[in-house]
Amino acid sequence: QRRALAELNSQLTEIRASAAGTAGAFAGAFATGHLISLADEWSSVNARLKQASQSSDEFSSSQKVLMDISQRTGTAFSDNAALFARSAASMREYGYSADDVLKVTEAISTGLKISGASTAEAGSVITQFSQALAQGVLRGEEFNSVNESGDRIVRALAAGMGVARKDLKAMADDGKLTADKVVPALISQLGVLRDEYAAMPETVSDGITKVENAFMALSL
């Protein structure tokens, strides 16, 4: 909890420095009703995360890594935890570990940020991608959602598979984007995605999201 408090203080300092002229958005992040909503969301998300974990140790470890990913990328912990929870069972069926699920989650989350996806678009991609993993293949509506809102994810997938981006649609239509190809391809590009995102300027919105995550982390 001390670590969470220190993280919160750090995030508060950063966002105060960058939030000049955006007092409305800053105040909204600390509205009592919103904080209560965050607490409820924390409980709900972690209930799903526990169900997706095979042990209490795995739950605790995954929870902390997901929070680290969220704070590093300025993305909502709830979105990242939801992707992990939805994908874990199906990925295990294909022989992947919890660490692999976390890496794919980070690749998707980082790719969405680089792509400039809105909250609604990111939510749609997370839902469709997790459904694709459950089916064992990325195609149809699932591929279209990622292709439309997560351009950087699609380019990373193409690079990881060693094919041209333009060829992915035909591969998706032919059912060739199977989980055993998609997962390692995305994981192989994680370092590139991290470096690319690290070079991007942080926005006020990113800062507010980090503060919201930090409030949630007080329960860690």
Predicted regions and their residues:
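ATP-dependent adenylate-handling ligase core
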Residues: 96
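The feature captures the hydrophobic core positions of alpha-helical coiled-coils
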Residues: 5-8, 15
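Structural motif
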Residues: 15, 77, 116-123
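Juxtamembrane/start-of-transmembrane alpha-helix segments at the extracytoplasmic/lumenal side
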Residues: 13-19
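Small-residue helix-packing and pore-constriction motifs in hydrophobic alpha-helices
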Residues: 9, 20-73, 82-93, 103-114, ...
